[in-house]
Amino acid sequence: MALFDDVKEVVVEQLNVSPDEVKEDSKFVEDLGADSLDVVELVMALEEKFDIEIPDDQAEAIATVGDAIKFIENV
């Protein structure tokens, strides 16, 4: 659950949403109100936080908090 909390922290900070709004199945655009620039900045923040690189083609597939967690777990 610690990974979820770390991802949630980044999402809350980047998208300026309440922690209560962020669930594993929350969609960045539809549920959390992100636009395309927000998503790019979110991916960059995740890369920095977890010291990983998310290729553009794979970043496009990350639409939910759970998608981000799965990607990070498999790096």
From Swiss-Prot:
InterPro entries tied to this protein: ACP, ACP-like_sf, PP-bd_ACP, Ppantetheine_attach_site
Sequence ranges assigned to domain Carrier in this UniProt record: 1-75
GO CC terms: cytosol; membrane
Record note on modification: 4'-phosphopantetheine is transferred from CoA to a specific serine of apo-ACP by AcpS. This modification is essential for activity because fatty acids are bound in thioester linkage to the sulfhydryl of the prosthetic group.
Domain of life: Bacteria
Keywords annotated in UniProt: Cytoplasm, Fatty acid biosynthesis, Fatty acid metabolism, Lipid biosynthesis, Lipid metabolism, Phosphopantetheine, Phosphoprotein
Gene Ontology annotations of biological process type: lipid A biosynthetic process
Subcellular localization, as worded in the UniProt entry: Cytoplasm
Gene Ontology molecular functions: acyl binding; acyl carrier activity
Modification O-(pantetheine 4'-phosphoryl)serine, positions: 36
UniProt pathway annotation: Lipid metabolism; fatty acid biosynthesis
Listed NCBIfam families: acyl_carrier, PRK00982.1-2, PRK00982.1-4, PRK00982.1-5
Family: Belongs to the acyl carrier protein (ACP) family.
Role: Carrier of the growing fatty acid chain in fatty acid biosynthesis.
HAMAP family named in the record: Acyl_carrier
The protein's name: Acyl carrier protein
Gene this protein is translated from: acpP
